[in-house]
Amino acid sequence: FLFAQLSQMNRICEQRLKLWNCYHTLLQPLEEEGLLKRPFIPKGCEHNGHIYYIVLPSEEYRDTIMDHLKQNGIQGIFHYVPLHSSPAGMKFGKVMGHLPVTEGYSKRLLRLPLWVELEESVISKIVNQIQRGLEELK
């Protein structure tokens, strides 16, 4: 399985970037309205498009959008637990003080579906459902 993917690596990476860019373009108006934040890629940097996420204004917004997507057959998931609060981090890590930025992002970040065979028309439907969910929160 891995060798088959490696032999198609360039095609897979190009397709993932194409889908990532589709999300990025379609979500721009929602970011301009201040309803969410999209990933920021600094000038001169490249990425491989392996995930697409949005950052919502609050944990309530994230959970509401995640539930709205689920009700419409779309799986969006929270992306990460901060390392310092993970079971291993709590056991082995050393944290000096509170980490409000890390903890805040972990509660507001929502990862959207992205895989090589996802179609742009499906991304359009996902973005439409995000927009509908945000309208319900207004």
Label for each model-derived stretch:
Residues 1-138:
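PLP-dependent aminotransferase class I/II
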